[in-house]
């Protein structure tokens, strides 16, 4: 299977986790786009969706899928999104597309988080993919310094990119993330950080992993 064929396969598999007659959360990225395309075929079975980015909203609306504002709803049955990296514990790095803050909010509200990815995203130790951190623009230099001193790695400002919230993204290279929950909490404690791309304190519940042998289902171990 090619990478796109794996993404297509997990997108189709994710449809089985869509709860009928509810509002679902939809993430951002290339794999999620495959899911939106698949979702269009069963759009009449759901009430609508919450989009994690402007790009996702546009794609959903192009299929006439109703998009709700998060403040209009009380619950989201399931959140379906991709990942840039995942470890065996279903801790994730996300935010390659720059939508990490909104993705975190929607994931926090959802009853269940289903991650869809191809097999190249599953790693033993995360960090080869640069870790995105959304920062207030006026604090970018301060945050870069604090990351270098307190976290390590090499943070750089993502060029020519502004988030949907009007902020900057720092991408941290040269990390080996052995304790994702601790690093997520430490990054969030730096003044000026809006959010970081570690989804560990609220990781995925289920990973649908596209492989050359089909879709593998990986479940988060509790405890």
From Swiss-Prot:
UniProt xrefs under Pfam families: Rib_5-P_isom_A (PF06026)
Which positions bind substrate? Answer: 28-31, 81-84, 94-97, 121
Protein name per its UniProtKB record:
Ribose-5-phosphate isomerase A
**Which residues carry out catalysis?**
103
Concerning its family, UniProt says: Belongs to the ribose 5-phosphate isomerase family.
A Gene Ontology biological process in which this protein takes part is: D-ribose metabolic process
Please name the source species.
Answer: Ruthia magnifica subsp. Calyptogena magnifica
Cited HAMAP family: Rib_5P_isom_A
Quaternary data: Homodimer.
- Catalytic EC class: isomerase
Question: So what does this thing catalyse?
Answer: aldehydo-D-ribose 5-phosphate = D-ribulose 5-phosphate
Q: What does this protein do?
A: Catalyzes the reversible conversion of ribose-5-phosphate to ribulose 5-phosphate.
Q: What is its EC number?
A: 5.3.1.6
Chain segments annotated as transmembrane: none
Q: Which UniProt keywords apply?
A: Isomerase
GO annotations of cellular component type: cytosol
- Which pathway does the database say it acts in? Carbohydrate degradation; pentose phosphate pathway; D-ribose 5-phosphate from D-ribulose 5-phosphate (non-oxidative stage): step 1/1
The record, for SUPFAM superfamilies, names:
D-ribose-5-phosphate isomerase (RpiA), lid domain, NagB/RpiA/CoA transferase-like
UniProt-listed InterPro entries: NagB/RpiA_transferase-like, Ribose5P_isomerase_typA_subgr, Ribose5P_isomerase_type_A
As one GO molecular function, the record gives: ribose-5-phosphate isomerase activity
Q: Which Gene3D superfamilies match?
A: 3.30.70.260, 3.40.50.1360
Keyword field contains Isomerase: yes
């Amino acid at each position: 299977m090619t990478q796109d064929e794996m993404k297509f396969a997990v997108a189709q598999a994710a449809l089985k986790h869509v709860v009928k007659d509810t509002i679902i959360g939809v993430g951002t990225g290339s794999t999620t786009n495959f899911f939106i395309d698949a979702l269009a075929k069963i759009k009449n079975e759901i009430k609508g969706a919450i989009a994690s980015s402007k790009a996702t909203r546009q794609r959903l609306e192009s299929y006439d899928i109703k998009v709700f504002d998060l403040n209009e709803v009380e619950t989201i049955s399931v959140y379906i999104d991709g990942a840039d990296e995942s470890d065996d514990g279903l801790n994730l790095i996300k935010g390659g597309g720059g939508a990490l803050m909104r993705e975190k909010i929607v994931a926090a509200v959802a009853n269940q988080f289903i991650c869809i990815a191809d097999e190249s995203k599953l790693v033993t130790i995360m960090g080869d993919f640069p870790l995105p951190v959304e920062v207030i623009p006026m604090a970018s230099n301060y945050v870069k310094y604090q990351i270098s001193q307190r976290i390590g790695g090499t943070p750089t400002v993502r060029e020519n990119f502004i988030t949907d919230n009007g902020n900057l993204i720092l991408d941290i290279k040269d990390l080996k993330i052995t304790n994702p929950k601790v690093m997520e909490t430490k990054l969030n404690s730096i003044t000026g950080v809006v959010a970081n791309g570690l989804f560990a304190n609220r990781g995925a519940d289920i990973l649908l992993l596209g492989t050359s042998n089909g879709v593998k289902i990986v479940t988060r171990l509790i405890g």
